[in-house]
Amino acid sequence: MKPLPDYNHSVVEQLNALTAAGALQADAAQLGVAAHLDRILADLKARKPAKKKSALGWMFARKSGPATTVKGLYVYGSVGRGKTMLMDMFYEMAPVSSKRRCHFHEFMADVHNRVHAHRQKLKNGETKQADPIPPVAAQLLAEAELLCFDEFSVTDIADAMILARLFTELFAHGCTLVTTSNVVPDNLYKDGLNRGLFLPFVDLLKKYVDVVTLDSPTDYRMEKLESLPV
């Protein structure tokens, strides 16, 4: 197989190159998602670069009005359809200086640890800021203006109760979100305790991301398993 061209600006082009090389099957649904990701790449490139700020700098910036936020993407569908592969292609190409890619539950564990650390500072008299969400959001913004999550799902009430307030801060100050999920946003935290308190986050999410489904007929995970020798 010939070495592939180094496509670093278009998910569509990289997908087509991999297909032409025989590494992937042609998949119209994947190309559709790739086109959405290319739109985000273009918007990120066109946006005026944000000045690097410390967490304290972000706290002061909160008072200066909303930042320009590039609309992100929420890709949902069954497992094995290629959602994570496409997001990873996008992440590597994203023209931003600070970005983070992780599993959603890893991110939320980090958030809860930061909230706990802030409450300890409050208890020890090291801060007078009673609400931990603004400083935690400021820390996250100082570290990454682009967040890419794998497997966005909400099953824990502690996560559910914090998401709307946290992402109100993140989105308002320029954070872009690209995420994969197995469920449509309206079914996040379905039948969860006090779900009514979680629903404002769903509305917020749909305001700042385009929601698309990856309904490829092929389960590439199963295809790989079936090709293995028994």
Give the role of each language-model region.
Residues 53-75, 145:
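Pre-Walker A (Motif I) flank of P-loop NTPase domains
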